[in-house]
Curated annotation (Swiss-Prot):
Residues 1-40, 133-171 are annotated as: Disordered. This is Histone H1, gonadal. GO terms for cellular component: nucleosome; nucleus. Keywords: Chromosome, DNA-binding, Nucleus. Belongs to the histone H1/H5 family. It comes from Echinolampas crassa. Pfam families: Linker_histone. It is found in: Nucleus; Chromosome. Residues 9-35 have a biased composition (Basic residues). Its main location: nucleus. The keyword Chaperone does not apply.
């Protein structure tokens, strides 16, 4: 029996090492701000209170049920936002707390008070705006008149040139 031939040991080729590439720097991802499917909580609360027209004010439970029904949002997720908004609005005077403390009890829409100084400022700014509008209208009218005069002059010039050409052509 013939013995199997031994192969000559071939020199092993080592795998080529590719030159090391510097790791790519990842640019920070810009997250798009997702817009909520509902208006701001403050607006929803004021709408709820206004819609219920309760004489003694609207309770937090009623406000929440109105928001859940009208805007179809998860009330459990909005609860902390509603509570914070109620407290802040009471503090600012936009809402009036009829009974209870903090974010509990009954709430009504508060009367927004304007000081005399702010009312005067508002009047002054309105008057300035009116004056500006009048000045703009006057300027525009003057421009229109000037443009019309230019057009008329150009047309007259053209007519005169045409007459002169006809007169030259006749003799």
């Amino acid at each position: 029996a013939a013995s199997p031939q031994k192969r000559a040991a071939s020199p092993r080729k080592s795998p080529k090492k590719s030159p090391r590439k510097s790791p790519k720097k990842k640019s920070p991802r810009k997250r798009k701000a997702r817009s909520a499917a509902h208006p701001p909580v403050i607006d929803m609360i004021t709408a709820a209170i206004a819609a219920q027209k309760e004489r003694r004010g609207s309770s937090v439970a009623k406000i929440q049920s109105y928001i859940a029904a009208k805007y179809r949002c998860d009330i459990n997720a909005l609860n902390p936002h509603i509570r914070r908004a109620l407290k802040n609005q009471v503090k600012s005077g936009a809402l009036k707390q009829v009974s209870g403390v903090g974010a509990t009890g009954r709430f009504r829409v508060g009367a927004v008070k304007r000081s005399a100084a702010s009312a005067n400022k508002l009047k002054a700014t309105r008057e300035k705006a009116r004056a500006r509008a009048k000045a703009k209208k006057a300027k525009a009218a003057a421009r229109r008149k000037a443009a019309a005069a230019k057009r008329k002059a150009a047309a007259a010039k053209r007519r005169a040139a045409k007459k002169a050409r006809k007169a030259k052509a006749k003799p």
